[in-house]
């Protein structure tokens, strides 16, 4: 017999086998269930998912378009900060979780839900990211995590148990040839993990990669673009007409110009996919303490990071950039990966980020070719930290080269003291004395 009256649950619903069974199981447990789907740019048959959820027994179904919010409030701040985890991962999955969680909490308030449920596994990062966000935005919310509930995971020990339950509940299951890995997609990236990828020495099959062309399929001629940034945010994309290498470099007004923030990002996605840009295969350290292997395709994000970092070299003060790199970039990347986006520390770090980006105004010319993002030039008409005449070997300006003698003398005082000390210890200038000793 079905229990009744336990309360209202908002379920993060994907339309797949797991969350469809969770939806039916929650109803069996006596909950009224509202199903929620976020459109963050993934390829999905949302209409079919809605019909399926309502047929299973969901009281209501919400589909919320969060693409613009995702780009403007998560992706572009990450671009400003040059966010990266462990030197390689551009945080595509992590970036989507705060915006999905916020959308869910909005519906929780509208529908007066006492509970929220998700289908995250008990070994992954996403359970942490979602639940931290839920509690930060709605401290009194109660979370149901079936894959951490013994009653659920003991009953559904494998896919066969889920399929049997789906048949019992008349849940339609779209049968396809099962791919031996799992995926998670949004407009920033797609991730592949689990299954055959759990062996870190297994080469991913060519047909796994969904978004980005293999290098053998990419054009053999470069495509030239210019990205214009305002305070570190991309505000214009110019796609230049095909030209020979003998013509003058293109200007920002030479070609098709796109200024809508969403369209800029989506167009860069298409260009990067076409030219084989943005694939990685890594082993990373999860927040919960285990290592995992992940393969990622991050097309537009790869181009934007290269362009943004290059422009910063032209327009950002040396010490400001060093502080941003050592503090803001590393801390915001950890905040994103570990699920602390909605926190006091993120607000503080982001306020520092915004200050660091005040001078990041200008344009970067790029060439896209065979998996490479090649910088061909950069320009800013408002920021004047770079002075070509000042650094020229062929001109004398206000830079007094004789002053360098004093600079070297002062900076080398401590080096001379260090050198005197090592000579006093009997050390020499031989290689075995001056270089690091190997154990």
Please give the residue ranges for each predicted region.
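Nucleotide-activated chemistry modules centered on ATP-dependent adenylation/adenylyltransferase
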Residues: 2-12, 17-439
